[in-house]
C-alpha cells in the first residue's frame, strides 16, 4: 500500500484500515468530520493526515491540539507504533470525541493517550514535547498562541500545521505578533494546501 507516493507496511496498513472502519462506525453517532467528506475518508483525511509523519518520521513526543476525529493525531500515533517509539498526546475537550479517540488508540495499538481538557490547560499535563500538530482548528496566529508554552525559547520543538489556500494571509497576520522560522511543505493531497513547519519561536508583542 502507498500513501502520498510512499510505501506503508502491511502492519500499518491494517491499523489504518481498522481505524477507518471504526471511524465510519462512530461517525454515524457523533460529528467527527463534515458528513460531506466521509465518502472520501482515505484521501481527504487519512492520506492528508499521514503527511505530518511523512515529513517528520521520528520516534518523538507529539502534542496534537484539538484532535477531534483523530486527524492527524491518531494517524501519527499509528505510524509511531511501527517505530516502537515516540508518543502522541491528543488534546480534545469534547468528551464524546475523546471517548472515540481512546477507543481508536486502544484498538489499533497506537502510541498515544488522550487528555480530555481545554487546549489552554494542556501544558499543565504535558510539559515537554518535540512536535505539535493541528488540523482544521484555528488560524496560524491562534495555533502559535496555543503552542507557545511548549515552543517559546525551545529550539528543538516544532509545529506542523495543515493550512488551506489562505495560508499566506495567515502567515502575515501571525508575523505581527511572532517571529519564527518557516518551512512550507506543499500538500501531496490538496493542490492549494500546505503544511507549515514552524520553529525557533519568539514573541514580538
Swiss-Prot record:
Binding residue positions for S-adenosyl-L-methionine: 66, 71, 119-120, 135
An annotated Gene Ontology molecular function: rRNA (guanine-N7-)-methyltransferase activity
Places the protein is found: Cytoplasm
Enzyme class: transferase
Signal peptide boundaries: none
InterPro entries on file: rRNA_ssu_MeTfrase_G (IPR003682), SAM-dependent_MTases_sf (IPR029063)
Domain of life, per lineage: Bacteria
Keywords linked to the UniProt accession: Cytoplasm, Methyltransferase, rRNA processing, S-adenosyl-L-methionine, Transferase
EC identifiers of the protein: 2.1.1.170
Listed Pfam families: GidB (PF02527)
Protein task: Specifically methylates the N7 position of guanine in position 527 of 16S rRNA.
HAMAP family, per database record: 16SrRNA_methyltr_G
Protein name in the entry: Ribosomal RNA small subunit methyltransferase G
Organism: Rhizobium johnstonii (strain DSM 114642 / LMG 32736 / 3841)
Amino acid at each position: 500500500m502507498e500513501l502520498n507516493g510512499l510505501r506503508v507496511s502491511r502492519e500499518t496498513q491494517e491499523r489504518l484500515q481498522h481505524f477507518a472502519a471504526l471511524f465510519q462506525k462512530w461517525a454515524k453517532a457523533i460529528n467527527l468530520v463534515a458528513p460531506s467528506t466521509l465518502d472520501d475518508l482515505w484521501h481527504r483525511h487519512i492520506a492528508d493526515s499521514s503527511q505530518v509523519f511523512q515529513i517528520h518520521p521520528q520516534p518523538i513526543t507529539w502534542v496534537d491540539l484539538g484532535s477531534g476525529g483523530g486527524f492527524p493525531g491518531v494517524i501519527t500515533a499509528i505510524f509511531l507504533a511501527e517505530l516502537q517509539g515516540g508518543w502522541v498526546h491528543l488534546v480534545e475537550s469534547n468528551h464524546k470525541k475523546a471517548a472515540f479517540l481512546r477507543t481508536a488508540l486502544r484498538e489499533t495499538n497506537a502510541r498515544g493517550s488522550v487528555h480530555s481538557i481545554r487546549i489552554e490547560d494542556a501544558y499543565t499535563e504535558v510539559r515537554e514535547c518535540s512536535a505539535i500538530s493541528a488540523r482544521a482548528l484555528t488560524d496560524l496566529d491562534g495555533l502559535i498562541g496555543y503552542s507557545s508554552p511548549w515552543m517559546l525559547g525551545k529550539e528543538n520543538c516544532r509545529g506542523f500545521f495543515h493550512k488551506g489556500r489562505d495560508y499566506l494571509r495567515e502567515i502575515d497576520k501571525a508575523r505581527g505578533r511572532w517571529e519564527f522560522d518557516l518551512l512550507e511543505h506543499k500538500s501531496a493531497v490538496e493542490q492549494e494546501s500546505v503544511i507549515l513547519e514552524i520553529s525557533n519561536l519568539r514573541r514580538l508583542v
